[in-house]
Amino acid sequence: MGNCADCLRGFFCPPKNTNIRISLPAVCFVWQIAMIVLFGVFIRYDAESDIRLWLQLKHTNNITSDIENDFYFRYPSFQDVHVMIFVGFGFLMTFLKRYSFGGVGFNFLIGAFGLQWALLMQGWFHALDPTTGKISIGVEGLINADFCVAASLIAYGALLGKVSPVQLMVVTLFGVTLFAVEEYIILNLLHCRDAGGSMVIHCFGGYYGLTISWILYRPKLHQSKRLNGSVYHSDVFAMIGTLFLWMFWPSFNSAITDHGSGQHRTAINTYIALASSVLTTVAISSASEKRGKLDMVHIQNATLAGGVAMGTAAEFMITPYGALIVGFCTGIISTFGYLFVSPFMEKYLKIQDTCGVHNLHAMPGMLGGFIGAIVAAAATEEVYSREGLIETFDFEGKFADRTVGTQGGFQAAGVCVAIAFAVVGGAVVGLILRLPIWGDPADDNCFDDEVYWEVPEDEEGILPVLEYNNHMTHKHQDISESNFSVEQS
């Protein structure tokens, strides 16, 4: 019996081999070749990007100017969303003192792979022509692909520094697949409205990553505690990511909203909610420290919670003061999450959430979904007009007889679907990632770029006393940087 246990332990917990010279190139080459083949078989330009079809469309619809092409309406929003995906998310994850290459570099890798797979997965569900078997893509498809990738990047935040790039490719492969299915169920079958993705992106991506992190729990992760934190310059780089996300979040939430008042209103509501969450985050962060000092962890993350929570309800008539209330509350809730919920989750639930995605994405996304359900159920003809209700909630076709109360119920059901897909899918993916074939780092080598990157030598070492704490704990109350000096030899 003891020999069997030793064999099992040896299979699932062998000595870590982080040499990915074969596995990473193999995965990248094979999967990219697969993308080329699948694109060749399925992907074609849509009517507004194919020259022949565009000329036919202009003639048929009496379009006199190329400015009517959807590209000119959607591309500014696409640019903003694309910057958020690769610069915003990438730099937000550079806060770790020795894992900035991995934060921004692996974000780049899985983003580039994920958007290709997303064009296929979402195309099969939303843009497949049954007569030709082809998928038509245009600028709106590019935006939706970026949205799809965002969920996997959010999941990466919970796993930051603890997994190999090969594992991240697997997380993205399954994450994009699960996203496409749950999005189709929520938006098409349940007919929920979720333009900014509180449910389908943030709630799903957050709990997907947290579940994987739970399955991959490392009881000896404290061996890398010296690296699980920030230094002054790494927090500054992370703040760059925060500012890009904060500035462009109105574009993120409104990018695929219908032209007209809905898109306009979505940008306004998101803009207002984001501003409100900044003030409440600063207030709670200062109040929680005995000398009133601000914690950069809170400022980098909780200030964005208003944008996450407004993702579903932003296109509804929530009113400007309603948007302020949403930002006000989520800024408080997110900051309290970093103060109390994350330490609780790590200690008692065995969930090691490196970036605190539960507080920035999962919890605000879930709240945003339920806020959307309440606002939808409370909609009236007096506020929207009958035509406005039809346009806002798309009460047409087989959904023409749906009431706002029923719509609110389905909106709430959409949140549950997102969480269910995240938890079940995350558990399965986590079990796959536990196989000893992925080249993941040992417990004492987590959060260290040197495992997977060629790292130049530092001119100066990092003094242990100047290390900032991580996104799970506070700084030691009795340590002040001014108490220490470096002696020159």
UniProtKB/Swiss-Prot annotation:
GO terms for biological process: ammonium homeostasis. GO terms for cellular component: apical plasma membrane. The chain crosses the membrane at residues 22-42, 76-96, 101-121, 141-161, 170-190, 196-216, 236-256, 267-287, 299-319, 321-341, 360-380, 413-433. Disulfide bonds: none annotated. SUPFAM superfamilies: Ammonium transporter (SSF111352). It is found in: Apical cell membrane. Residues 1-21, 97-100, 162-169, 217-235, 288-298, 342-359, 434-489 are cytoplasmic. One of its GO terms (molecular function) is ammonium channel activity. The keyword Cell membrane applies. Keywords: Ammonia transport, Cell membrane, Glycoprotein, Membrane, Transmembrane, Transmembrane helix, Transport. It is a multi-pass membrane protein. Pfam families: Ammonium_transp. Residues 43-75, 122-140, 191-195, 257-266, 320, 381-412 are extracellular. InterPro entries: Ammonium/urea_transptr, NH4_transpt_AmtB-like_dom, RhesusRHD. Glycans are attached at N62. The keyword Transferase does not apply. Functions as an ammonia transporter. May play a role in the elimination of ammonia in the gill. Belongs to the ammonium transporter (TC 2.A.49) family. Rh subfamily. Homotrimer. This is Ammonium transporter Rh type C. It comes from Gasterosteus aculeatus.
